Amino acid sequence: MWEIVHSLALSRRSVLGGLAATLLPSGLSLAGPSSETLLHRDDFTGGLGQWVIEAERGGRFRAEGGVLDIDSPAGVTLWFRHALASPVAIDYEVMAVSEGGPNDAVSDINCFWMATDTRASGGDVLAIRRSGAFAGYDELRTYYAGIGGNRNTTSRFRRYVGRRDDRPLLPQHDLSAPEHMIAPNRWYRIRLVADGNRIELLRDGTPMFRLNDPAPYTCGHFGLRTTKSHLRVRNFRVYRLPG
């Protein structure tokens, strides 16, 4: 079993902000940095309604006070319900918690983006329920990044090709230097980019992984991912990039 805690204490400001984001007439939008267009947001004050959870062995998942808390004893993926299309950027802040809890391992700040499933009609990742075990995602076509994996000893980027037991890894996307790992209890700014052939992950404004993809994945879902770890996430935003 997993426990989901929904925050019911919505402030007047967060309610009005949410209505502004969801009730804009067609053709109107909110602008982000550099004339980027805000498509989606989650300030984690109104529960987990925008997320689908696949948890291997339960856990505690709650959204309250502006923070999504992911406390999991095993593998878990939280899929953002809205499908995304390139050119797009996904922004959020994330922390690996070290406060003495049973899952406070400081490990595995991971994610999927532009994910589709080769087994599903139309490729919809939400059409198939998975156990949360990592091997269950092999048949996705997606970009995947794992920061501080293997108990905070590796950081890797992969382009999944939709085949079981086939997760290609290029040498330049297999990092092991200390500066590419995770510091405990520190907020990191993550930006994921899918803009035509340009695929990127930036951490605190600095490119960490880059791929010039000649056959880019141009639509799909975003998923937060970790395993036996305790993460906190805040300020989740999705922008359409100019182009």
Indicate residue ranges for each PLM-predicted region.
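C-terminal alpha-helix/helix-terminus motif
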Residues: L19, L23, G27, N235-R240
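N-terminal secretory signal peptides
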Residues: M1-L10, L19-P25
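Extracellular glycan-recognition regions
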Residues: G32-G243
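C-terminal segment of N-terminal export signals and the immediately downstream linker at the start
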Residues: A9-L10, S26-E36
